[in-house]
């Protein structure tokens, strides 16, 4: 609750964080550009969307026309999230890609997640990463092109309406965390050095 207070979010209000990498993701920004005008301030949650440096200006301009009251409706649009630890601590639900660093952090923090794996990666590794989280019960996986803004919003609302489901997802994510990853990696490096 302290992280929410620092972000100006009232106690008890839920926060959804939508983040798609530092450059952003064109398809997901298109979906979010359609979704944000659907929020009327009565949706029961706040949304923080990071558009990425490549897409921020165009998205801000478009939403200035289609959702001029978005701030009053609980929506914050950012180019980039510079205070990521605070924002992720405050998040009740995260929407993102499935890169290894991202999902490692989400597991460590125990954050329920809606994952849209990038289709533009080698050997489809993001979907493979996402399916591990899904199988454990920590993530809902959506594939690009198989959903739209309306169905994504419905998924968000459904998850946020079920506190027990969010708790179970959080526990599932935490169960996958490798809290000693640094020590294990260093151990492997040292073992390799000593063998040579």
Task: Explain the meaning of each model-derived region.
Residues 5, 165-179:
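A short, well-ordered alpha-helix in the C-terminal region of glycosyltransferases
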Residues 7-94, 127-130, 135, 142-151:
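Donor-nucleotide binding loops and adjacent catalytic segments primarily
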Residues 22-25, 54, 118-122, 175:
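Short histidine/acidic/glycine/proline-rich micro-motifs that form metal-
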Residues 33, 149-153, 182-190:
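Short, amphipathic alpha-helical "lid/cap" segments that border enzyme active or binding sites
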Residues 35, 62, 155, 169-172, ...:
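A ubiquitous structural signal for well-ordered alpha-helices
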Residues 84-126:
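A donor-sugar binding/catalytic signature common to diverse glycosyltransferases
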Residues 134-141, 150-159, 169-172:
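Amphipathic alpha-helical segments at domain termini/boundaries
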Residues 158, 178-196:
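C-terminal alpha-helical cap of glycosyltransferases
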């Amino acid at each position: 609750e302290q992280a929410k207070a620092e972000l100006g979010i009232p106690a008890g209000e839920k926060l959804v964080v939508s983040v798609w990498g530092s450059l952003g993701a064109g398809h997901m920004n298109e979906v979010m550009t359609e979704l944000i005008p659907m929020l009327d301030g009565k949706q029961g949650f706040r949304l923080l969307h990071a558009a990425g440096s490549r897409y921020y200006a165009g998205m801000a301009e478009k939403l200035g026309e289609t959702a001029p009251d978005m701030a009053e409706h609980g929506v914050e649009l950012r180019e980039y999230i510079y205070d990521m630890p605070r924002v992720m601590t405050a998040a009740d639900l995260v929407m993102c890609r499935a890169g290894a660093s991202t999902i490692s952090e989400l597991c460590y923090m125990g954050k329920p997640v809606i994952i849209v794996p990038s289709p533009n990666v080698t050997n489809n590794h993001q979907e493979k990463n996402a399916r591990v989280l899904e199988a454990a019960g920590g993530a809902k996986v959506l594939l690009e092109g198989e959903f739209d803004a309306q169905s994504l919003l419905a998924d968000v609302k459904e998850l946020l309406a079920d506190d027990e489901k969010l708790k179970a997802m959080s526990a599932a994510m935490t169960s996958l965390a490798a809290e000693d990853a640094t020590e294990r990696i260093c151990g492997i490096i040292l073992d390799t050095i000593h063998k040579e």
